[in-house]
Amino acid sequence: MSAISLIQPDRDLFSWPQYWAACFGPAPFLPMSRDEMDQLGWDSCDIILVTGDAYVDHPSFGMAICGRMLEAQGFRVGIIAQPDWNSKDDFMRLGKPNLFFGVTAGNMDSMINRYTADRKLRHDDAYTPDNVAGKRPDRATLVYTQRCKEAWKDVPVILGGIEASLRRTAHYDYWSDTVRRSVLVDSKADMLMFGNGERPLVEVAHRLAMGETIDQIRDVRNTAIMVKEALPGWSGVDSTRLDTPGKIDPIPHPYGEDLPCADNKPVAPKKQEAKAITVQPPRPKPWEKTYILLPSFEKVKGDKVLYAHASRILHHETNPGCARALMQKHGDRYVWINPPAIPLSTEEMDSVFALPYQRVPHPAYGNARIPAYEMIRFSINIMRGCFGGCSFCSITEHEGRIIQSRSEDSIINEIEAIRDTVPGFTGVISDLGGPTANMYMLRCKSPRAEQTCRRLSCVYPDICPHMDTDHTPTINLYRRARELKGIKKILIASGVRYDIAVEDPRYIKELASHHVGGYLKIAPEHTEEGPLSKMMKPGMGSYDRFKELFDLYSKQAGKEQYLIPYFISAHPGTRDEDMVNLALWLKRHRFRLDQVQNFYPSPLANSTTMYYTGKNPLGKIGYKSEDVVVPKGDRQRRLHKALLRYHDPANWPLIRQALEAMGKKHLIGGRRECLVPAPTIEEMREARRQNRNTRPALTKHTPVEHQRQGLAANKKRGKGAGR
């Protein structure tokens, strides 16, 4: 039995009294048109949610969870999905909301959804009917907010979703290669909710319904607002400079009064009298009612070291048990970021996932296929959060480090609901997982450590001794799910954290024996210590141990099964030599990767800070602190990606050039230890032909034809004058 957590909410998520509109009951689907509102008997919506995704009434889609959550509180909720952003008209289709607009770009960041890691345009969108691209604008959060404000200037707009969440402070923007302001500043929205939004969304909705204005709601966890000064009653720590944090407000006397200096005069003894016994209130924790003043937007935009410093502070203030508020100046105002919300309890998670989802797309889409839905329609989310803390991943900053798990009964009920109600179900559950497959019910065994810890990862460089690695709850869940009538197979498609799995070989045996469909995805990400240390990923020893156990248990089960490793190229900290060593490892182990991924600098990730600043925010930041090697430039990024696909003939010329430049010509040839073959005679002839046909690139300083003729004439005249 795990110890009771010290991180507890002020009230249960479902303890608020229902709003009066609860009398209408739940809608079959949240309405997307006035006709649907009329059929429900609504004259207006209390809350309208605007999203960049198609509306799928499924708990894997953020707007469905938010909408059904608010509906359960008694509010009438409408959805405007993928509106035409070229005018305000589409944003007015449901009328004026009584309380607020909720705006999100969708389940994905709109820029990542639209562009590849090499900034090339994508031609599909998995969250749109029939996979059609172009149904949402770039920086959708900004555009949607502006249109909502145009439509109804006096209606509050609240931002949410992954795009807004990861842009709550000044941040590096990979697509424009510059530091941008907080999205709250640029959008002119009234409030931003970061991370999972159930707690702040419900509280703000009820407080608005009870008559408070959006400007009066300033103290809700998981929200960011604009302020002119720090909130009353909060004391601040000035961290606008490197390594010189200091108090902004005077430190109060510990006994509540200022004692006068001694004057050396004799003091007559006082007659002692009986005093009433008073009970002192508990002393406040050092992080309570405390904020950190970050370097301003203007400072971090002009100073990369200060940017890394601000990023380091933000990542250390993500534990809801001890996080302090953050404050960052933008012009003449400040972005105020309240501490993260308290994680949902198992009972609250069960209630959220038990809401009346239809588990299918809205009927307005007809027979259109939505790829993102097709991928998850037979999968089940069993938990939230991740304590891995990988530098390139933003799950910790969005969902938190504390695992929020559903109960076994709740998950079993959902499996049965899929079996009985979802069209096309054939008896195979495609995934039981979440951000990670095997963190279900795992948590810190020490309540005190859980409340006060500021580690970025619970498993790097080694697994924390406080961390529970007993997979018994997961094993029991798998076994119970397999026994359900009508269930032929339970697959695990989420990534397995193999360094935790090897701590409990029973889990690997259960996985290999029953839950792998031939291939299992895992993500070592690299083989070399340089990039692994910047990613905060374990070394290959854990991978080798996992593979040994996986192969053993697969053989015992009479199954031929394989691991599919995933790797990232061009991650900060990666030298060309590191990628060559990774390519040689792949060749030795006979891996030929089809899909490879260059590092994608997404907002707020620690790896993105390394990419932009060349500094390592995982350690102490200073102007002379550790510099990080960063693969930049199209050619180097193409090379790193090409080395992951060393077997592709199209990549051989680039790899050969790089190996020659590194002094590694011995890796070119037909021997077993070589990485790529030597060029054929035909390839060398083709290379010479291409070199002959190439011309220098023209620039604005290159003379055009008539200028060349003029220059030639001048040279002749000059020669004649010299005779």
Swiss-Prot record:
> Which residue ranges does the record annotate as region Disordered?
686-723
The entry's keywords: 4Fe-4S, Iron, Iron-sulfur, Metal-binding, S-adenosyl-L-methionine
Q: Please list the residue ranges annotated as the Radical SAM core domain.
A: 372-650
- Where, by residue number, does the polypeptide cross the bilayer? none
Q: Which InterPro entries does this entry report, sorted A to Z? A: Elp3/MiaA/NifB-like_rSAM, Methylthiotransferase_CS, rSAM, rSAM_horseshoe, UPF0313, UPF0313_C, UPF0313_N
Q: Which GO terms describe its molecular function?
A: 4 iron, 4 sulfur cluster binding; catalytic activity; iron ion binding
Residues recorded as binding [4Fe-4S] cluster, renumbered to this chain, are C386, C390, C393
UniProt biased composition (Basic residues): 714-723
Task: Give the protein's cofactors.
Answer: [4Fe-4S] cluster
Cofactor stoichiometry and binding?
Binds 1 [4Fe-4S] cluster. The cluster is coordinated with 3 cysteines and an exchangeable S-adenosyl-L-methionine.
Would you identify the family this protein belongs to, as annotated? Belongs to the UPF0313 family.
Q: Which PANTHER family match?
A: UPF0313 PROTEIN YGIQ
Protein name as it appears in the record: UPF0313 protein YgiQ
**Which organism is the protein's source?**
Salmonella typhimurium (strain LT2 / SGSC1412 / ATCC 700720)
